[in-house]
């Protein structure tokens, strides 16, 4: 007999929602049992700052970026911002990196 396989499912949101709606969507995704929430790197807000804020609105859901093009950010500042989200979220950051 085959054992069932648990497949984690995430949700990708646009960041163009007003803040109260975006925070509510993040809480709803967490309550619905989604494994992760992703925001695009290019949008209306700074992705890592927004994820840091969403960390305060959630407690379990993992928080991820879309692909961050490495040439678009200073490496040291990206490392600091990522570390800040990682600390603020209790280790829930998924940082997607790419060449552009």
Region spans (language model):
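N-terminal beta1-alpha1-beta2 module of alpha/beta enzyme domains
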Residues: 1-65
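Structured beta->alpha junctions
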Residues: 43, 67-70, 74
């Amino acid at each position: 007999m085959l054992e069932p396989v648990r497949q984690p499912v995430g949700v990708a949101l646009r960041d163009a929602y007003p803040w109260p709606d975006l925070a509510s969507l993040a809480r709803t995704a967490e309550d619905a049992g989604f494994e992760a929430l992703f925001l695009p790197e290019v949008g209306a807000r700074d992705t890592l700052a927004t994820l840091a804020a969403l960390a305060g609105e959630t407690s379990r859901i993992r928080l991820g970026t879309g692909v961050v093009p490495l040439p678009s950010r200073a490496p040291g500042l990206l490392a600091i911002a990522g570390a800040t989200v990682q600390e603020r979220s209790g280790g829930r950051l998924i940082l997607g990196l790419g060449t552009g």
